[in-house]
C-alpha cells in the first residue's frame, strides 16, 4: 500500500481532477442500467412490447429483435444522468476550481496524492441560503481512483472537510450522493452523517429512478477536540 498525503488543489492538478470526476461518474452507469432493467415499467416495455409483437406477427425472432433493439436506448438513459452531472459541474464550480474553491477562506478543494499522482479529490463550499439558522458547508466531488480504494483515502478526505468546517466555524456539513452509491452512503453513515431525505437531480434521473440522497453532519462544539 503506497503512502498518500492530502494537500490543497493546484492548477497543475486540473487534468487529473477532471479525469477522476468523469471516470468516477461513468463507473455508476452499469449499476444504473441494471436498476433500470428491473423497474416494472421497463419490464412492461421489454416483455409486453415483445409479447404484443409476437401476437401480431407470430414471429419469436421479431419479438426478440424488438427487445434487444431497446437495450442501447436503455443504456443511453442509464448513462445520461452521470454525463449530465459532469457537464453541469464542468460549466459551473469545476470550470475554474481555483476561483470557485480557493478564492475565499470559507471554501477549499483538496487532492490526495500518492507517488506524485492525484488519486483522490474533495471540495467544500459554503451553502448560500439566508433562511438557514446555522452556518452550513457543503461537501462536493468526493472521488478516489479505483486502484487506490480500500486504503482509507475517502474517509481521510471527508475528515479533512469536517475538520475544515470546524476550524471555519461551521455548524453543519451537508452532502448529496445517490441511491446507487451504496459504499459512499455506508462511508458517510459510518462517519456520523444522517440521511435527511431524497430527491431527483434531473428529469434524466427520474427516468431511471436515480435518487439524490441528502446527508447532514452536525458538528460538535470546537471545545470537543479535533476529529
UniProtKB/Swiss-Prot annotation:
Its EC number is 2.3.1.-. Residues 64-227 are lumenal. Acetylation on Lys-99 modulates enzymatic activity. It is a single-pass type II membrane protein. Endoplasmic reticulum (ER)-membrane-bound lysine N-acetyltransferase catalyzing the N6-acetylation of lysine residues in the lumen of the ER in various proteins, including PROM1 and BACE1, using acetyl-CoA as acetyl donor. Thereby, may regulate apoptosis through the acetylation and the regulation of the expression of PROM1. Acetylates and stabilizes BACE1 immature protein, leading to increased steady-state levels in neurons. By acting on BACE1 expression, may regulate amyloid beta-peptide formation. N(6)-lysine acetylation in ER maintains protein homeostasis and regulates reticulophagy. Keywords: Acetylation, Acyltransferase, Endoplasmic reticulum, Membrane, Signal-anchor, Transferase, Transmembrane, Transmembrane helix. It comes from Homo sapiens (Human). GO terms for biological process: amyloid fibril formation; amyloid-beta metabolic process; gastrulation with mouth forming second; negative regulation of apoptotic process; peptidyl-lysine N6-acetylation; positive regulation of gene expression; regulation of macroautophagy; regulation of reticulophagy. SUPFAM superfamilies: Acyl-CoA N-acyltransferases (Nat). The keyword Membrane applies. Residues 1-42 are cytoplasmic. The keyword Transmembrane helix applies. InterPro entries: Acyl_CoA_acyltransferase, GNAT_dom, NAT_camello-type. This is N-acetyltransferase 8B. Residues 61-214 form the N-acetyltransferase domain. Allosterically regulated by acetylation at residue Lys-99. It is an enzyme of class 2 (transferase). Belongs to the NAT8 family. The chain crosses the membrane at residues 43-63. The modification N6-acetyllysine is found at residue 99. It catalyses: L-lysyl-[protein] + acetyl-CoA = N(6)-acetyl-L-lysyl-[protein] + CoA + H(+). It is found in: Endoplasmic reticulum-Golgi intermediate compartment membrane; Endoplasmic reticulum membrane. One of its GO terms (cellular component) is endoplasmic reticulum-Golgi intermediate compartment. One of its GO terms (molecular function) is L-lysine N-acetyltransferase activity, acting on acetyl phosphate as donor. Induction: Up-regulated by ceramides. Up-regulated in the brain of Alzheimer's disease patients.
Amino acid at each position: 500500500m503506497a503512502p498518500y498525503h492530502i494537500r490543497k488543489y493546484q492548477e497543475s492538478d486540473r487534468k487529473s481532477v477532471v479525469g477522476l470526476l468523469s471516470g468516477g461518474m461513468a463507473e455508476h452507469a452499469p449499476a444504473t442500467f441494471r436498476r433500470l432493467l428491473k423497474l416494472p415499467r421497463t419490464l412492461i416495455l421489454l416483455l409486453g412490447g415483445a409479447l404484443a409483437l409476437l401476437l401480431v406477427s407470430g414471429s419469436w425472432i421479431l419479438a426478440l429483435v424488438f427487445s434487444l433493439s431497446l437495450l442501447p436506448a436503455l443504456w443511453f438513459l442509464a448513462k445520461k444522468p452521470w454525463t449530465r452531472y459532469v457537464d453541469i459541474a464542468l460549466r459551473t464550480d469545476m470550470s475554474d476550481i481555483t476561483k470557485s474553491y480557493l478564492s475565499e477562506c470559507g471554501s477549499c478543494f483538496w487532492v490526495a496524492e500518492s507517488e506524485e499522482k492525484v488519486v483522490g479529490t474533495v471540495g467544500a463550499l459554503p451553502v448560500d441560503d439566508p433562511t438557514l439558522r446555522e452556518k452550513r458547508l457543503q461537501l462536493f466531488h468526493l472521488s478516489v481512483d479505483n486502484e487506490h480504494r480500500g486504503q482509507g483515502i475517502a474517509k481521510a478526505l471527508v475528515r479533512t472537510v469536517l475538520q475544515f468546517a470546524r476550524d471555519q466555524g461551521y455548524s453543519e456539513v451537508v452532502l448529496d450522493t445517490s441511491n446507487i452509491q451504496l459504499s459512499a452512503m455506508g462511508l458517510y453513515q459510518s462517519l456520523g452523517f444522517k440521511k435527511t431525505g431524497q430527491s431527483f437531480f434531473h428529469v434524466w434521473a427520474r427516468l431511471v429512478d436515480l435518487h439524490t440522497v441528502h446527508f447532514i453532519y452536525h458538528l460538535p462544539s470546537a471545545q470537543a477536540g479535533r476529529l
